[in-house]
Amino acid sequence: MSMLKVSNIQKNFNGNHVLKGIDFEINKGEVVAILGPSGSGKTTFLRCLNLLERPEQGILEFTDGSLKIDFSQKISKADELKLRRRSSMVFQQYNLFPHRSALENVMEGMVVVQKQDKAQAREKALSLLEKVGLKNKADLFPSQLSGGQQQRVGIARALAVKPDIILLDEPTSALDPELVGEVLQTLKMLAQEGWTMIIVTHEMQFAKDVADRVILMADGHIVEQNTADKFFTCPQHERTKQFLLQAKIPLELDYYI
């Protein structure tokens, strides 16, 4: 049974119809990778899921009945906060607070949003930094960390508030090639632990290896979606075949920290 469902998501920017009636749902523990060319609407769609962008139309609902938002109506502050507490975003550019240590960045949501005790939040934050392989970097500031390390801090921060769903917007696109693997390995670990994730990515082999389902978006539409294996081996839509041909997917690629 699906955990989150959205229907008929419509979004315009300055007269440009960016999302043209997107229907989507995701099950608890499922990992969905969204692929697509630049300008396809994939990042905009992801940002709509926690109101970083506001669609003009569409419905978002958690299927347990706890939250339903009609984007054509005024959204209450209570519903907005409820949605953001149930989802966490991992950004392309990390978006860490520059004057706070890695530990303080991870603690932020627990202390400020969830009002947890600082000592308890510190203990949890250290545990999460250990999970992503950065406990020994806890006291360093973002400027003292590599891009891959900053992104892993961002992932730890996203996990800290125990979200129902993690939204990741091209988490490796700003990284030097040699740093990509450490982030992908971390995401692979989270997938194995059963976290629910939607990942906008251009890492084709990673999507094939880790995602339960892969979606191709183009021109504001979902063109095709299927299990990862069938998406890459038996694409049904001509647009998907062209996209995969242009991507020149490598046959084998392993990721290491």
UniProtKB/Swiss-Prot annotation:
Cellular component per GO, a single term: plasma membrane
Signal peptide region: none
Localisation: Cell inner membrane
Gene3D superfamilies for the chain: P-loop containing nucleotide triphosphate hydrolases
Binding site for ATP: 36-43
Keywords of the record: Amino-acid transport, ATP-binding, Cell inner membrane, Cell membrane, Membrane, Nucleotide-binding, Transport
Pfam families documented for this protein: ABC_tran (PF00005)
Membrane topology reported for the UniProt record: Peripheral membrane protein
Domain ABC transporter stretches: 4-244
InterPro entries noted in UniProt: AAA+_ATPase, ABC_ATPase_HisP-typ, ABC_transporter-like_ATP-bd, ABC_transporter-like_CS, MetN_ABC_transporter-like, P-loop_NTPase
GO molecular function, one term: ABC-type amino acid transporter activity
Protein purpose: Probably part of a binding-protein-dependent transport system for an amino acid. Probably responsible for energy coupling to the transport system.
Family (UniProt): Belongs to the ABC transporter superfamily.
Official protein name in the record: Probable amino-acid ABC transporter ATP-binding protein HI_1078
Organism expressing this protein natively: Haemophilus influenzae (strain ATCC 51907 / DSM 11121 / KW20 / Rd)
